[in-house]
Structures are given as C-alpha cells and as structure tokens.
Amino acid sequence: MRTVADYQFGAGAGEALFPLGEELTVRRSTGGRPRQVVADEGRLVSYGVDGRFTLGVAGGRRLHETLDGEYTVAVGDESEPFVREGKNVFAKFVVGVDDAVRPRDEVVVVHETGYVLAVGRAELSAAGMEEFETGMAVKVREGAGDPASE
C-alpha cells in the first residue's frame, strides 16, 4: 500500500499515510480485497476498484503535514464554512493550487492559512482552477466538520 501511495501522491506519501510500526486496521471486502485503512484518528484512505486511493480527512491531514503543499487546493474565508460541511469547491473561490493537480486527482482542500478543510477529487486542472470564474473545481468527498472538534 505504501508503494501505491508513493505512486499516486509522490515520494514519501506511503510513509506519511502508513508509518512503520503504527497499528492500522484494514477493512476488507468479502472477497478479501482491502477496502479501507483506518487509524485511531479516522479513515485514512479507501482503496478503489481502479487501484487508486480516495482520501479520508485523517489521511488528508497526514499528507498535508508531510508533502509541503502537494495535491492541495486552497480557499479563503468566504467558502470555508461550506467546504467544512462537505460542500463542493467552485473555481471562483480557489486562491491557490498545486501546479501538478490534474482532473480526477485526489486533493486536500485547505484554508489559505494552511489548515485542512476537506478532501475530494479535482474536477479541473490547476490552470483551470486559477483561470476559470465558474465551474466546480473540487468534488468534495468529506468535510473536516466543526473546527472545535479538531
């Protein structure tokens, strides 16, 4: 699983998501295929049938702390409460994005000051998110919820 994470998110992602020696729970399908990887703080990733991971908020936080802004989309104060609740991110509210983001990449949505708001799937390229004034930039899968719970 570390190899898949390194391939999908870049070098160091596997160790960030699945540190050696940490007790992780792997939930499997009835056929034995891994479905979810869960840590004490919550779901890290789900393993899709396409062989790629979809991030949980806990996994997004781990990646954000380790990968120095890779696979992130930043938004400002105006959209923060909506994104926290799990609402989608629209291009007009994007204030920054990693240049390497492509459509269908898993991304971490952060506030412009740096804390994690949500995780989801990019619908536009980085250039599209920066240039477009309309359209969905990120299809949010899971919002981080109430900031008091962090």
Where are these regions (language model features)?
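N-terminal intrinsically disordered, low-complexity, charge/repeat-rich segments that act as generic
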Residues: 1-49
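Solvent-exposed alpha-helices and their adjacent loops that cap or buttress functional pockets
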Residues: 28-30, 99-102
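Generic short beta-strand
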Residues: 35, 106-108
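Non-catalytic interaction/Regulatory regions outside core domains
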Residues: 40, 102-105
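Beta-strand/loop-dominated core regions that host nucleotide or nucleotide-derived cofactor-binding catalytic loops
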Residues: 51-95, 101-102, 109-150
